């Protein structure tokens, strides 16, 4: 082998705020790999056009242990800026429930086309099937129901329609208005 630069410290790229250094850089040329583990088990790679994190053994954990802080997943917003697409919200977790938050006007899309959308626009929430396929809501629990609930007009919530899996019937709990 010959001599090759694997990485270098670039003092000229350091950032300053006028009185102190705010960022220092270790530079790795394109197509370098940062490899951790005797068998190169965890690798970080940048080719010049894409970046990869590769784990080849065991589970890969991404952990933020700062109290009440989040993990934010951001990407280009379509116009050169960055946007949070979803976050793991540690400030909402209460020990029993964990939260994955999708900001208003986010769309969770499923299928290659995509075909199924779940979204909230800040006011209303929607589940939409966009192709000529069926939308199937299925409960596979033995003797369990599918229950549709909404506001009861007095600040509470009540069931309006139950697909009763125990008694194999449809129950309508409130007045039914059939319109032409």
Give the role of each language-model region.
Residues 1-180:
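Intrinsic low-complexity, repeat-rich intrinsically disordered segments enriched
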């Amino acid at each position: 082998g010959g001599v090759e630069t694997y990485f270098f410290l670039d003092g000229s790229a350091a950032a300053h705020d006028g009185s102190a250094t705010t960022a220092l850089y270790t530079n790795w040329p394109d197509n370098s790999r940062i490899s951790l583990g005797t068998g190169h088990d965890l690798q970080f790679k940048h080719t010049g056009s894409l970046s990869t994190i590769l784990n080849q053994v065991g589970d890969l954990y991404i952990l933020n242990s700062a109290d009440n802080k989040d993990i934010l997943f951001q990407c280009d917003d379509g116009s050169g800026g960055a946007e949070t697409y979803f976050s793991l919200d540690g400030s909402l977790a209460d020990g029993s429930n964990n939260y994955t938050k999708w900001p208003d006007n986010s769309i969770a899309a499923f299928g290659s086309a995509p075909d199924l959308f779940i979204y909230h626009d800040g006011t209303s929430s929607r589940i939409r099937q966009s192709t000529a396929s069926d939308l199937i809501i299925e409960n596979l629990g033995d003797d369990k129901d599918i229950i549709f609930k909404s506001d009861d007009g007095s600040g509470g919530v009540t069931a309006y329609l139950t697909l009763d899996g125990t008694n194999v019937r449809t129950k309508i709990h409130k007045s039914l208005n059939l319109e032409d």
